[in-house]
C-alpha cells in the first residue's frame, strides 16, 4: 500500500493472525455463544475481520444445525460492516462470498454499507461486538472536510487522529454488556489528543483489557500499537494487562490493574504493579531521591539497544519515559563518552554473539 494512501485514508490492513487474536481477546470465539449476536466492523476494508467472523459463525452454526437457509438468514441479520471506499467495498463483498461458498451458502444479501461511518447511526446501541482496525490519519490529512470529525467529543483535544473518533463511534454502537476491541496506535494513553477519551474512560470505566504490542511492529506504518478491549458494564475496576510475545506469537497475561494504578497526572501508563508504583512515586514526588536522571538519549534503534539483553557488560539501567518501564541499554562507551573500540568489545563473547545475530 502506498504511503500517500495510508496518510490520507488511514487504511492499514490487518494480518490474519492478529485478526484471530483480537477476536479471541474480544470473546468472539467459535462456539454457540456467538450465534444470534450482532457484530460490526465499522471500517471493514477488504473484510479481514469480517471473513474470519463469518467463518467462525458458519462453523459454530453448522456444528449443530444443517439448515443452510437459516444460516444464510442469520448471516444477513447479525453480521454488519461499513466501508467508505467503493473499490474496497466491492472486494470485501467478493471475499465474504468466497468464505460462505465453502459452507454451501450463496447469494447472501450482506448488511455491509458503502458509506461514511461517521454519518451512520442505525447501529447505535444495537451491537454485541464491535471490532476492527480503525483508520489512522490526522485530521489535517483528511481528504474531505473534517467537520464530521470535530463533532465527536473524543476529537476535542490536540491534533486529533481519526482512530480516536472511531473509539467514540464504536462505544456508541455497543448495546448494554457489549464488547469493543480495536487495534490502534497506543498514543491515546498519554497524548494531548487522547485527553477527552481518557476522561470518559475514567468516568465510565469501560476499559477492561489491553494487549501492549511493545516493539513488535505488525504494520508497515511505523507506530507503537495496542489492542484495547472495552465492555459496557457497570462498576468495573479491573484492567487485564497483557503483552504480545512475538517469539511465540501469543498474548501473555502480566497483571490485573485498577484504574487508580494506571493513572498519573491524567495520563495512562501500562506495566506491572511494582513498576507502576515506582513510576507514580517518581512522577508525583517533588523530591529527586528516587531516581536521578543523568542523561536522556534516543537510540533510534531500540530493538537492538534496549531490552532483555543476554549480557550485563557495557549496559546501563534505563527508564523509558513514555512507558515508565525499567530496562537495560547496551552502552558501548567509556566514562568520557567515547565509543569503545571493536577490539575491546570483541573480548566479550556474549556481546559479539549478540551483535553478530
Feature map (PLM): residue ranges:
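C-terminal substrate-recognition regions of SAM-dependent nucleic acid methyltransferases
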Residues: 219, 226-357
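Short coil/turn motifs at beta-sheet boundaries
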Residues: 72, 220-223
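SAM-dependent methyltransferase catalytic region
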Residues: 1-210, 215, 227-229, 233-238
Amino acid at each position: 500500500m502506498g504511503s500517500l494512501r495510508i496518510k490520507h485514508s488511514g487504511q492499514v490492513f490487518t494480518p490474519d493472525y492478529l485478526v484471530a487474536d483480537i477476536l479471541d481477546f474480544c470473546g468472539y470465539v467459535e462456539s454457540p455463544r456467538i450465534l444470534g449476536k450482532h457484530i460490526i466492523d465499522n471500517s471493514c476494508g477488504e473484510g479481514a475481520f469480517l471473513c474470519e467472523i463469518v467463518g467462525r459463525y458458519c462453523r459454530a452454526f453448522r456444528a449443530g444445525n444443517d439448515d443452510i437457509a437459516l444460516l444464510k438468514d442469520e448471516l444477513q441479520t447479525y453480521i454488519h460492516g461499513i466501508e467508505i471506499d467503493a473499490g474496497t467495498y466491492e472486494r470485501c463483498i467478493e471475499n465474504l462470498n468466497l468464505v460462505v461458498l465453502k459452507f454451501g451458502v450463496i447469494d447472501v444479501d450482506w448488511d455491509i454499507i458503502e458509506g461514511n461511518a461517521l454519518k451512520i447511526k442505525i447501529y447505535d446501541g444495537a451491537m454485541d461486538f464491535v471490532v476492527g482496525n480503525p483508520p489512522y490519519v490526522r485530521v489535517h490529512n483528511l481528504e474531505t472536510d473534517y467537520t464530521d470529525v470535530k463533532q465527536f467529543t473524543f476529537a476535542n483535544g490536540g491534533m486529533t487522529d481519526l482512530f480516536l473518533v472511531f473509539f467514540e463511534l464504536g462505544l456508541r454502537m455497543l448495546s448494554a454488556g457489549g464488547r469493543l476491541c480495536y487495534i490502534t496506535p497506543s498514543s491515546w494513553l498519554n497524548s494531548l489528543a487522547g485527553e477527552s477519551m481518557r476522561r470518559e474512560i475514567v468516568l465510565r470505566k469501560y476499559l477492561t483489557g489491553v494487549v501492549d504490542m511493545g516493539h513488535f511492529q505488525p504494520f508497515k506504518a511505523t507506530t507503537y500499537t495496542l489492542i484495547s478491549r472495552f465492555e459496557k458494564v457497570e462498576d468495573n475496576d479491573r484492567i487485564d494487562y497483557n503483552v504480545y510475545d512475538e517469539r511465540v506469537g501469543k498474548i501473555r497475561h502480566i497483571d490485573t490493574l485498577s484504574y487508580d494504578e494506571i493513572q498519573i497526572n491524567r495520563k495512562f501508563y501500562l506495566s506491572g504493579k511494582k513498576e507502576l508504583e515506582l513510576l507514580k512515586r517518581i512522577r508525583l514526588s517533588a523530591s529527586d531521591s528516587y531516581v536521578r536522571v543523568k542523561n536522556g538519549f534516543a537510540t533510534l534503534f531500540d530493538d537492538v539497544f534496549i531490552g532483555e539483553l543476554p549480557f550485563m557488560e557495557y549496559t546501563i539501567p534505563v527508564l523509558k519515559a513514555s512507558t515508565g518501564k525499567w530496562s537495560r541499554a547496551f552502552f558501548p562507551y567509556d566514562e568520557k563518552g567515547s565509543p569503545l573500540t571493536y577490539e575491546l568489545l570483541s573480548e566479550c563473547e556474549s556481546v559479539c554473539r549478540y551483535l553478530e545475530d
